[in-house]
Structure formats: structure tokens, C-alpha cells
């Protein structure tokens, strides 16, 4: 556990379900293994994979593997990480929550990671109004708190009724996802309106001089040792 210093993170664009694995190395073979174990064997083959332009995702071997599975590879750049904003947002949450737990855990971030992922998967997401868990599996998860302090859902458990309820939930999962898509579209429109309201128009014509900002790949200083390499 102590030699794990990298974290490979995957987020589904729609359901917001997140998978993450601590790694000692982050080579193309490690990325390939992660794609197979954490994505393909659990959720099926993705249509598009958006990643940074690290060598582990842009090697001949990884491209060949993606081609065999008919996965389209797209890449964000270090100067514009917002191109993969979904994962960037999740990374901030994971790093923030890990930092909160590190003092009590004496720096054992690998052991704390499952707790952080569990919290993220079982909390409603602002953009969809649903939890990533329910968007993925069609039903809400029973959290440990419900077993210690019985709720109506756990105290009135009946195997037959439970099977029927699960079947109904699966029948309604497409409707739930359609409603979430409407909510997501509305949320994105509101974000766009807020962003556009603060944009100052600067009309340019051919021949105008412009200042080009060269952005380095420096870490966020608040992330300390938890930042990307």
C-alpha cells in the first residue's frame, strides 16, 4: 500500500459514476488493465474515452488496444484541463475529501479512498438531482447507517416485495435517466448563462496584436503531495 503514489480516475459523463484505483506506476499497461477491469467488465465498452495526453494514454499499445475495442480516444491538454472538466471536478472532490481524512488516517490515503468514493457515489449530484449509484444501477443503495438505525425500507424488508420493487425500479430506470438528462441540460444552460454574463466582448480584426498567455503545467499548491504529476 505504501508504494502507491498515483491515482487513476474514471468518471462516466452522464451518470457521474466514478471509478478510481491507486497505482504504484502509471504506464500504458496499467491504464489498459484499469480500462478492462474497472470499466469494460463492469459497464461495457465506452464509445469515447477522454483523457489527458500522458504517454500512458497515447502510446501505440494503448491506441491499438482502444482500436480493438472500437473506443474513440480524445485528449485534453495541460494548458486547458477544462476540456476534461468532468474528471477535473471529481479530482478536486477526491483530493479535498482525502485531505480531510489524512490527519486521522495518519497519511494512509489508499485506505481512505474507498470511503471517499462511497460518499461521492451515494450523494445526489447537483446537475442530475440523482445519486451516481442510482443512475448506474437503478436503485438507491442501503447505507450502513440504515442497518444500525432501521428505516422503513430496512425494517419492513420482505424478499418477495423487495424483488418486485427492484423489478419496478429497473423498469423505470430509463425514465429516471431521461428526467436526469432534462435536469442536466437545464443545469448546463444555467452555467453557460452565468459564464456568458461575465464575458467581455473584445472585437478583433486581422492585423491586431494579441497577448498569448503561456500556461505551464504547475500543480495546484493547495493539493500538496496529492496533486497530479
Where are these regions (language model features)?
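Integrase module of LTR retroelements
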Residues: 1-176, 183-184, 189-229
Amino acid at each position: 500500500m505504501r508504494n502507491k503514489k498515483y491515482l487513476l480516475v474514471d468518471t462516466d459523463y452522464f451518470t457521474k459514476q466514478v471509478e478510481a484505483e491507486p497505482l504504484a506506476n502509471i504506464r500504458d499497461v496499467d491504464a489498459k488493465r484499469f480500462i478492462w477491469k474497472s470499466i469494460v467488465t463492469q459497464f461495457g465498452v465506452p464509445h469515447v474515452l477522454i483523457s489527458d495526453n500522458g504517454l500512458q494514454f497515447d502510446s501505440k499499445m494503448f491506441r491499438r488496444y482502444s482500436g480493438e475495442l472500437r473506443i474513440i480516444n480524445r485528449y485534453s491538454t495541460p494548458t486547458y484541463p477544462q476540456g476534461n472538466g468532468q474528471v477535473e471536478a471529481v479530482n478536486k472532490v477526491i483530493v479535498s475529501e482525502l485531505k480531510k481524512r489524512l490527519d486521522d488516517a495518519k497519511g494512509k490515503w489508499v485506505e481512505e479512498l474507498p470511503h471517499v468514493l462511497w460518499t461521492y457515489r451515494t450523494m445526489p449530484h447537483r446537475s442530475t438531482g440523482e445519486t451516481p449509484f442510482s443512475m448506474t444501477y437503478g436503485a438507491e443503495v442501503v447505507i450502513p447507517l440504515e442497518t444500525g438505525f432501521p428505516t422503513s425500507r430496512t425494517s419492513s424488508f420482505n424478499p418477495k416485495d423487495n424483488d418486485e420493487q427492484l423489478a419496478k425500479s429497473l423498469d423505470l430506470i430509463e425514465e429516471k435517466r431521461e428526467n436526469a438528462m432534462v435536469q442536466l441540460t437545464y443545469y448546463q444552460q444555467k452555467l453557460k448563462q452565468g459564464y456568458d454574463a461575465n464575458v467581455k466582448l473584445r472585437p478583433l480584426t486581422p492585423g491586431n496584436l494579441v497577448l498569448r498567455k503561456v500556461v505551464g503545467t504547475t500543480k495546484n499548491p493547495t493539493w500538496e503531495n496529492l496533486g497530479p504529476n
